Design a protein with these regions (language model features):
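Structural micro-motif
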Residues: 59-68
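Short active-site neighborhood of thiol/selenol oxidoreductases, capturing the structured segment around
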Residues: 13-23
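Alpha-helix C-terminal capping segments
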Residues: 9-14, 33-42, 92
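N-terminal "domain-start" segment that seeds a small globular fold
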Residues: 1-11
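Short amphipathic alpha-helix with an adjacent loop that forms part of the alpha/beta core around
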Residues: 11, 58-59
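Non-catalytic, surface beta->alpha helical segment in thiol-disulfide oxidoreductase systems
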Residues: 69-96
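Short cysteine clusters
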Residues: 26-29
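Thiol-based oxidoreductase modules, predominantly thioredoxin-like and allied folds used
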Residues: 2-4, 21, 33-55, 61
Length: 96
């Protein structure tokens, strides 16, 4: 899972993808990481919420982990907290 900054984020979301906003100190974020690694249907990126505070404000991130799926540059679905693989795959139901 590639860690991206705010600049890379802007170009990454132009393709269908999943972005996880998380931190290094967050227990649920650490638990979620291996599950995110199993998603192969679309690119999965990680944004460090501590380093990219302005991006978190822009996207209304109030809790980590927050996982957002993007389709054609727009937010499609959002989940907060540790998730199962099946819940993550439900975020991708836009016909990939």
């Amino acid at each position: 899972m590639k860690i991206i900054n705010a600049e890379e984020f802007k170009s990454a979301i132009n393709e269908d993808c999943v972005v996880a906003f998380s931190t290094s100190w967050c227990g649920p974020c650490k638990m979620l990481a291996p599950t995110l690694e199993t998603i192969t249907e679309v690119p999965v990126y990680k944004v460090d919420a501590d380093s990219e505070a302005q991006l978190c404000i822009e996207y209304g991130i109030r809790s980590v982990p927050t996982i957002i799926s993007f389709k054609e540059g727009k937010e499609y679905k959002r989940l907060v907290g540790n998730q199962t693989k099946s819940k993550l795959l439900e975020m991708l139901d836009y016909g990939l």
